From Swiss-Prot:
CDD domains tied to this protein: DRE_TIM_HOA (cd07943)
Record bears the keyword Manganese: yes
Reported pH dependence: Optimum pH is 6.25-6.75.
Family: Belongs to the 4-hydroxy-2-oxovalerate aldolase family.
Pathway(s): Aromatic compound metabolism; 3-phenylpropanoate degradation
Annotated source species: Escherichia coli (strain K12)
Protein EC: 4.1.3.39
Note: Presumably stereoselective for the 4S-enantiomer of 4-hydroxy-2-ketovalerate.
Lineage: Bacteria, Pseudomonadati, Pseudomonadota, Gammaproteobacteria, Enterobacterales
Site feature (Transition state stabilizer) residues: R14
Signal peptide: none
Protein name: 4-hydroxy-2-oxovalerate aldolase
Active-site residues, record numbering mapped to chain: H18
Amino acid sequence: MNGKKLYISDVTLRDGMHAIRHQYSLENVRQIAKALDDARVDSIEVAHGDGLQGSSFNYGFGAHSDLEWIEAAADVVKHAKIATLLLPGIGTIHDLKNAWQAGARVVRVATHCTEADVSAQHIQYARELGMDTVGFLMMSHMTTPENLAKQAKLMEGYGATCIYVVDSGGAMNMSDIRDRFRALKAELKPETQTGMHAHHNLSLGVANSIAAVEEGCDRIDASLAGMGAGAGNAPLEVFIAAADKLGWQHGTDLYALMDAADDLVRPLQDRPVRVDRETLALGYAGVYSSFLRHCETAAARYGLSAVDILVELGKRRMVGGQEDMIVDVALDLRNNK
């Protein structure tokens, strides 16, 4: 660590959207954002779970628009920067400008781990707006460390000043993380930061985040009570407690985060965010974590096991954006019974 302060990036109000089908109220957003700000996290990501303009038939409709959520959070923070997520092909540069006007100052431009080339326009435009611009390589387990580093280099070339290893499936272990960060560090400029976005499907979210920091990672994503897709993200309060034990500088108030997790976030969960049969299957099969609720709906509709659907999706190497294929897979399984 060399005494540097970690950048703590909260994702409760974006990845956490998946856990409650994108149904946060504006008052929920205000309360959670204020609590996070009071606890001194560095940034608070706010958007539909699938990023700007994710509210749709395919991904699920949100209770409010991205801009309403962003404005609600921006109104109550004094310290933290408001971040947002943009997936090229779902959100556009016009949506990004609107998010900036609503108060977002950080954007993470997210692509599948082998498709960084679709992010050029969005990264360049974010830099023109003066935003803190991050490249976000989703499903990072699905390509080799060397290929991931080449994709990271593309994003750096477009103007991203930080590149994330994103374990969207919660499928990686500590060795996988170390290999990817070493590859990125060898390829990127020394001044380009790196970040880690973990999911907890194999209960390794915190361990993988620690491994990333040990390899020189600058920014850590986490969420209160692990609120996120699948078994959730690295739980923020747990990561901070572990970082404290390691003597790392993080600048946040552990007890305030613990209170916010239990008092504000956990009561909102209509399905427990935890490692269980279905979420473990996600991590084991390497499936996009936000498929969970969609798979459970399809399983109930067609009289199937959600685990069987998830395992088949993993075999077919489905990636984020292919939510519409969940019903196809379910119908195939039913017809083959």
